[in-house]
């Protein structure tokens, strides 16, 4: 996935964009019935970071056993990605621009005060 190709997964991608990007993840040409190696699958390489050990073991077994479609794997990835990103997206939506400006103003005043004291110390030592 590359930002240059606009196929990266953004933290704030809405459901439609996320689904489109997941569907575009390249896979090999093996049929549903054929066993697949999860370590060679782009979809698995992403989803393995979003699931627990038990889920990972079950998914790996499905890959090796055959019968796993890439459509299913991509839907599973989409489901896990959505669940992972939703809390972040909800929190982002809650934060208003005014809150951010207020926090930046408060902290910039604190930082300026500290920096001014440090600069004065340095001038006195020189």
Please give the residue ranges for each predicted region:
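Conserved nucleotide- and phosphate/pyrophosphate-binding catalytic cores
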Residues: 1-126
